[in-house]
Amino acid sequence: MPADTRPAAIVLMGPTASGKSQLAIDIAKRWGGEVISVDSVLVYRGLDIGTAKPNAAMRASVPHHLIDICEPWETYSAADFAHDARAAIDMIVRRGALPILTGGTGLYFRALLAGLSDMPPAHPEIRAMIAAEAKRDSWATLHTRLAEVDAITAARIHATDPQRIQRALEVYLVSGRSMSDWQNQPPKQRLPLRVLKLVLAPTHRKVLHFRIAQRFKAMLDNGLLAEVNALRTHPSIHAMARPLDLPAMRAVGYRQCWEHLDGMYTAEMLYQRSVAATRQLAKRQLTWLRGELDALWFDPEHDQSRIEKVMEAFLNR
């Protein structure tokens, strides 16, 4: 069999709070790599503490890509990510470095590695019309309308998910075809890379739960509430009728802090709700990761030497 001459890339996945960011940096230092963030929240400027965003020292130690590229009142789609990540990968490979893609946003990984079917681009006027109808009639009503034209997509979207309802209706109104119909098209060509998929996840669920709780407490101690308050009072966000519908503000921890600052519940309830929401996020991520049948799983506390051996075998073959 001829040797596989495609450039190598590392895909490092895992649930939140599993230690992916530091491991990605360690791999980059050891093997001459650059890190590409695969995270739908790290793209936003100003969301630092609550996202456990790699700090300045970490980002100075090895090059990082696709962090702090959007304002929090902007939208950034999986298609946007796939386009930007491909450009970053091409640049890294041309430099002779190793692309290391790390994060926990499954949709972004799928968009990049498996490809997305072509869909109509965003249409600002149609979006504005849908938003106005939602303000008048409610997103639940628009969800019902979506079900009438695209029952398959509506069944996958919760009635309280305005971003996805809006996009599904936008696709239908712009093209006259349902989103599910578009998604049934063959995807674009996959990446021409030789990929090693690693999953970093504690073996025992209790360990992950402990890490989640400790990390959120540290976020609060490090000024998360002040960070959220700065976002709440930013003119571009404060002027919005429904700022909590922004993708950035729907991130785990940020919505709960916002609601606490609005007086909806106590500091203790804020902590409990945020930890519970983060656990649910981790559970969803683990469910998705179990479907990645070609991925190798590692425990962050016990498998460092095993990761080293797997990396060496992959890169030297």
UniProtKB/Swiss-Prot annotation:
Residues at which ATP binds: G14, P15, T16, A17, S18, G19, K20, S21
Listed GO MF terms: ATP binding; tRNA dimethylallyltransferase activity
GO terms, biological process: tRNA modification
EC number: 2.5.1.75
Domain of life: Bacteria
InterPro entries in the cross-refs: Dimethylallyltransferase (IPR039657), IPT (IPR018022), P-loop_NTPase (IPR027417)
Reaction it catalyzes: adenosine(37) in tRNA + dimethylallyl diphosphate = N(6)-dimethylallyladenosine(37) in tRNA + diphosphate
Gene3D superfamilies (UniProt xref): 1.10.20.140, P-loop containing nucleotide triphosphate hydrolases (3.40.50.300)
Family per similarity comment: Belongs to the IPP transferase family.
Job description of the protein: Catalyzes the transfer of a dimethylallyl group onto the adenine at position 37 in tRNAs that read codons beginning with uridine, leading to the formation of N6-(dimethylallyl)adenosine (i(6)A).
NCBIfam families: miaA
Protein name, UniProt field: tRNA dimethylallyltransferase
Classification of source organism: Bacteria, Pseudomonadati, Pseudomonadota, Gammaproteobacteria, Lysobacterales
